């Protein structure tokens, strides 16, 4: 009986662990995420959506057919965008103050990645520099 209980507990653990990441249909994306993609990447199609459940958090990883990867929280708010190093992100996805700083200080470069967390936001430029800004868009430092 003990072995059966242990086996069932292990089976339950494995089953729930396997459900952490799951490929889902794009209709399962929050409406805000669908609207965001349509507004900022109108010529791209969604190739894959992966729902990630970790503890009490749910997020969505979206890969577009142009190889751009976006990450959304459970409400559909975008917090990360990655492109190929040769691809410029649309200006509309970058906060205006960050975009203006880059245009003024790095006129020959463009933004390829953007990520926001609870305390700051970080971008990667086409020349591989990584710049860190606070949430209001004020430049803080170059990240090595």
What are these regions (language model features)?
Residues 69-83, 130-143:
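A short, surface-exposed beta-strand/turn
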Residues 80-92:
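Intrinsically disordered, low-complexity Ser/Thr-rich linker and spacer segments
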Residues 2-9:
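Sec-dependent signal peptide recognition
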């Amino acid at each position: 009986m003990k072995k059966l209980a242990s086996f069932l507990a292990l089976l339950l653990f494995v089953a729930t662990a396997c459900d952490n990441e799951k490929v889902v249909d794009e209709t399962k994306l929050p409406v805000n995420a669908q609207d965001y993609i349509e507004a900022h990447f109108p010529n791209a199609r969604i190739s894959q959506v992966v729902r990630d459940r970790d503890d009490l958090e749910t997020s969505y990883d979206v890969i577009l057919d142009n190889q751009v990867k976006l990450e959304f929280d459970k409400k559909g708010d975008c917090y990360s965008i990655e492109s190929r190093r040769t691809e410029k992100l649309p200006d509309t996805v970058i906060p205006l103050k960050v975009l203006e700083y880059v245009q003024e200080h790095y006129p020959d470069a463009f933004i390829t990645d953007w990520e926001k967390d609870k305390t700051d936001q970080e971008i990667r430029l086409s020349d591989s520099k990584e710049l860190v800004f606070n949430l209001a868009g004020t430049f803080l430092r170059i990240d090595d």
